[in-house]
């Protein structure tokens, strides 16, 4: 019989844990701060940004917004990312993608330091996932899958796991993270 693993209790537990961590940091004079970097006014980005602001507010993370117009240049965006990288008061960065066509996605991603890349989009963050090192962060969806399994105490060691899709943002990182937990992983794709 199948067991449904609901996300809501996982989110509630993580929010409680993160709020406590934020309070501990604030007691030491550190205000956890997230940079949100957005180019343009796409409605889906705006909606996602509102959700980010709400979630950060619930756990005590400050948000610093960097908004560029849709016709911004790559140089302008790279300057913003340099500011984020060098500001010790900013602890993480969420760069909204996809970027408008005038941007070279690879160059922009490479400009963000992995230790501030909370979305796991930089090559450095992915290298951390694939080499099992503490460089950067795992992509959020892949990390969420593992968090859900851990919350429900799903044993992974020695088990067979199937991952549908092999994208760099979900499938491959999820497969590597499951492999790290000693699961035998099969990747499935449409080919």
Language-model segment annotations:
Residues 1-10, 87, 103-110:
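Helix-enriched interaction subdomains in cytosolic or periplasmic regions
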Residues 92-156, 160, 174:
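Anion-binding alpha/beta catalytic cores of soluble intermediary-metabolism enzymes, centered on
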Residues 31-40:
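Short beta-strand segments enriched in small/hydrophobic residues
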């Amino acid at each position: 019989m199948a067991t449904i693993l609901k996300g809501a209790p996982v989110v509630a537990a993580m929010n409680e844990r993160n709020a406590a961590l934020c309070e501990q940091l604030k007691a030491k004079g550190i205000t956890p701060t997230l940079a949100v970097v957005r180019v343009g006014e796409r409605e889906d980005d705006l909606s996602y940004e509102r959700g980010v602001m709400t979630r950060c507010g619930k756990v005590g993370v400050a948000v610093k917004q960097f908004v560029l117009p849709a016709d911004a240049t790559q140089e302008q965006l790279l300057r913003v990312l340099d500011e984020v990288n060098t500001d010790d008061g900013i602890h993480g960065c969420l760069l909204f993608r996809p970027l408008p066509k005038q941007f070279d996605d690879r160059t922009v991603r490479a400009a963000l330091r992995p230790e501030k890349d909370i979305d796991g989009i930089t090559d450095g963050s992915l290298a951390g996932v694939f080499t099992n090192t503490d460089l950067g962060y795992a992509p959020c969806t892949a990390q969420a899958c593992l968090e859900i399994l851990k919350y429900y105490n799903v044993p992974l060691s020695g088990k067979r796991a199937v991952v549908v899709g092999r994208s760099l943002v979900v499938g491959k990182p999820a497969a590597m993270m499951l492999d790290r937990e000693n699961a035998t992983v099969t990747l499935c794709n449409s080919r």
